[in-house]
């Protein structure tokens, strides 16, 4: 996977986060995609600072992997006053949406845009998926 590093990321309380979105592709022809409404919001555990070119980046500032951040003895996150279910370095989407609403962000409109990106990403991979399905999936209309 290759991704562009965002130098000025959206943060919550100064902490970087990412979204773990669960997607199931049950058919390629016709294309059938399901996006689970609940996911995970995973946090870095130190306040965000832009990386310096001549120094090694602090993984607790820039990475949101639970397997890395669970070892941070100086973890800055435990919960959020605007979300009942926000606890620790992994939140539910429900907790994240509570914080978005508290900041007057239309979570439904945002999630609609996220779904659109997910679908377009899968469509961009469709030629490769089609090839793999032709070789390995006995029934093209049903993956399972």
Residue ranges with predicted function:
Residues 1-144:
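Catalytic core of tubulin tyrosine ligase-like
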């Amino acid at each position: 996977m290759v991704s562009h590093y965002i130098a000025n990321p959206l943060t919550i309380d100064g902490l970087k986060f990412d979204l773990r979105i669960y997607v199931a592709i049950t058919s390629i022809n016709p294309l059938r995609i399901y996006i689970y409404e609940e996911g995970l919001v995973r946090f870095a555990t130190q306040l965000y600072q832009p990386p310096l070119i001549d120094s090694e980046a602090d993984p607790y500032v820039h990475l949101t992997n639970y397997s890395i951040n669970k070892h941070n003895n100086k973890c800055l996150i435990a919960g959020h006053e605007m979300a009942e279910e926000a606890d620790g370095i992994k939140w539910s989407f429900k907790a994240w949406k509570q914080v978005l609403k508290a900041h007057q962000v239309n979570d439904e409109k945002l999630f609609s845009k996220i779904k659109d990106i997910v679908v377009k990403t899968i469509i961009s991979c469709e030629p490769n998926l089609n090839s793999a399905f032709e070789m390995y999936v006995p029934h093209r209309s049903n993956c399972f």
